[in-house]
Amino acid sequence: MLSLSKHEDIDERNGVPRLTSIFRTDDQKMFAESLARFFAANYDIPKRRKLVASEPGYDPAHWRGLAELGAMGVALPEAHGGSGGGPFDTAIVMGAIGTSLFGSPYLSTAVLGGGILDAGGGVLAARHLPAIAEGKRKLSVAYAEPQARYHLEDVATSARPDGAGYRLEGKKSVVLHASSADAIIVPARTAGGQRERRGITLFLVDAKTAGLDRRDYATIDGQRASDITLSGVRVGKEAVIGETDGGLALLEAAAERGIAALAAEAAGAMGYLYETTLAYMKTRKQFGATIGSFQALQHRMVDVFTACESAKSAALGAALALGERDPAARARRISGAKLQIDKLGRHVAQESIQLHGGMGMTDELSVGHYAKRLTMIGLSFGDTNFHMARYTAAMRAA
């Protein structure tokens, strides 16, 4: 019989893996337990399958429930209705989301959009952050363009002066959860050439603004995304987030927070896959014995367990890296964590499917759904080639 112990980060009351290495206070531990109970009581694969087949791809009641738990404002300032937490608190939420495979605009709203508005400050932050913390406002960030290949500074969308404001023209791609967003943060070029770092300005655009057209679709993991065309979209000067021409720094900081958050989500998903595969190997019989008694498969499960532990370390490292003041060191640590998470995620997903045999490929089994999500995480905010190049450049700059 397979003798590997249960994952050390399992809540014995409900079997939900969690990132206990992230916990620094008793409040964080209780928060994580509340999230685990919430998802265990309200969300599972059959429910998820129904939700992803309908619009908007998630249950608004679940969204309100998360807001009531304080998840939406966990990293937002207390002055604007948040909890004043940081990367570790966000990691706790994202770890629980990864374990449950909960699909929603949480990343785009609370982590990316809310973080950008908070960093930009001013009237926009005071006006919108309290509603985000209460779960009453959802955001999307249109950080990608068709030609950009993960380069945030590659912005062809233009923002030209138009009376008392600006006129936006351009295209954005794979804008996460734009279909359910109340407003979209749009980077546009107010000065400079297409790949210049200076000259990018962030605008908060109401999702129903005339000239903003969407083509909505589902991604392979059941999330929602849109390709957006901006045709003469008019916004006032009050829509500018932060400083004119200085939006790239806000966007890059948001992407790094997004990577750290996704690392925690991936670690939670991998923990679930390990537990599910371990339980299957202890019950599935072949040749008159449970397959967990076969030494070759035990060795593979040890590798999966080791990968899960390494993923937790990578997630913790990414959260810690957000506090690094040196840009080159921060870039190196964030990209290093992303490379590690992507590699480990592929390994754990592939092994979990293979160890389940043919049924591992079916839609009825949960492991395939987690594998798809890990695949999408691997492609978010830069793939392996992009982050290898970024890591190398940061090493040379050190």
Model-derived features with residue positions:
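A short core secondary-structure module
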Residues: E169-D213
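A generic local secondary-structure boundary/capping motif
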Residues: H128-P130, Q147, A156-S158, K172-L176, ...
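Helix-loop "lid/cap" segments that line or gate small-molecule binding pockets
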Residues: L112-G120
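Cytochrome P450 C-terminal beta-domain/meander region
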Residues: H151-E169
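Alpha-helical interface subdomain recognition
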Residues: D11-S104, G120-L124, A131, G135-K136, ...
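Flexible, small-/acidic-enriched active-site or ligand-binding loops
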Residues: Y150, D154-A156, V174, V205-V240
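A short, Trp-centered hydrophobic/proline-enriched beta-strand micro-motif
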Residues: G135-P146, V186
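Leucine-biased recognition of intrinsically disordered, low-complexity hydrophobic segments
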Residues: L2-L4, L19
